């Protein structure tokens, strides 16, 4: 049987980090087994579902590179199918109409609680065989089996057993004419041939209810894999403040999509002690059965380390567009400075994120207006005009502007003055960047461009008072 998985977010908010991991594991499992991955949008909550959230989910999936073979499929476009299946259950005596008011339902629950029983529907309409009537309280309820036990072997959690006596006759169609979650997902997964349902363990309690519906429909029951939640660094439930933010905020924070993918893959799954994986390695090695049953903790330092690895090792040309995105967010005119790929080469050993890289790179795209006063006092003092002047002279004479030609000119300047390279580099670094910290001096000067470098040296000479 061909493996088919699905990711089925509700568009009531953005795709957060937990949802992204679920999508990744569903995608990896399908790809690992040579199967198909389906994207379904569970938008039957009409009050909370928004087009903005749908667009954000699709954008995040695209940014992460999680392509789907089918979809997006929208539940709101399948209501007629849900009605058809509900009517089938009604005709077979496996579901029934009920018309209790909210007050009557509240009274049932209160009576159960007074007896120290679980608050739930008491099955009052179960055997009444009530006909359809136009009523604002009309619902369709599923006849849950009265006796026996629901047993399933979760691919992550192991064997789980729940007595049917713990379950009531749940509503499968609401008064507004829309299906409930537990009913719609069963019909969807049945129709779509889903073989493995991979989702968060907050859905474990839904699973026995859904299995009973599958069996009532004589539909094949898929395998289930319930992943533990992701905790924050203190071991508490994730919040927006501690990492549960919109996935696209990780893009804005300067993380590479494949770095986030690598990190999320390891957030609950492992292959020995290996930390870094190519996409092909993930596809070859991932098996949902190997996902840990214990909750994973978010570790932003580890994510930073993974991201820095890819900043250091990826082709600079592939990183450049993402650096340009970060620079644009800072209001930088990219055309006013060096090629982004050259900036990547210069800075990637010094930062963990593209946001940091962009912030450091601004100096090469905008006029230098401020200087670190401590750096000026130390390196642009009287006497610094000598190495600066010689460097300017030789840089102005460079034929083809490159890191190599700049490096040669600066070494020639140091040799001509019989100075160590640091005596040339440090005043030049302050002249170009306004600070005493920057990448290799040849890269620093090269990125300023010939005209920009000469202008900044001239400004430094004026500052020294030796122009």
UniProtKB/Swiss-Prot annotation:
InterPro entries: aa-tRNA-synth_I_cd-bd, aa-tRNA-synth_I_codon-bd_sub2, aa-tRNA-synth_I_CS, aa_tRNA-synth_I_cd-bd_sf, Glu-tRNA-ligase_bac/mito, Glu/Gln-tRNA-synth, Glu/Gln-tRNA-synth_Ib_cat-dom, GluQ/Sye. Signal peptide: none annotated. A motif ('KMSKS' region) lies at residues 237-241. One of its GO terms (biological process) is glutamyl-tRNA aminoacylation. ATP binds at residue 240. Pfam families: Anticodon_2, tRNA-synt_1c. GO terms for molecular function: ATP binding; glutamate-tRNA ligase activity; tRNA binding; zinc ion binding. SUPFAM superfamilies: An anticodon-binding domain of class I aminoacyl-tRNA synthetases, Nucleotidylyl transferase. Gene3D superfamilies: 1.10.10.350, HUPs. It is found in: Cytoplasm. A motif ('HIGH' region) lies at residues 9-19. GO terms for cellular component: cytosol. It is an enzyme of class 6 (ligase). Its main location: cytoplasm. It catalyses: tRNA(Glu) + L-glutamate + ATP = L-glutamyl-tRNA(Glu) + AMP + diphosphate. PANTHER family: GLUTAMATE--TRNA LIGASE (PTHR43311), GLUTAMATE--TRNA LIGASE, MITOCHONDRIAL-RELATED (PTHR43311:SF2). This is Glutamate--tRNA ligase. It comes from Xanthomonas axonopodis pv. citri (strain 306). The lineage of its organism: Bacteria, Pseudomonadati, Pseudomonadota, Gammaproteobacteria, Lysobacterales. The gene is gltX.
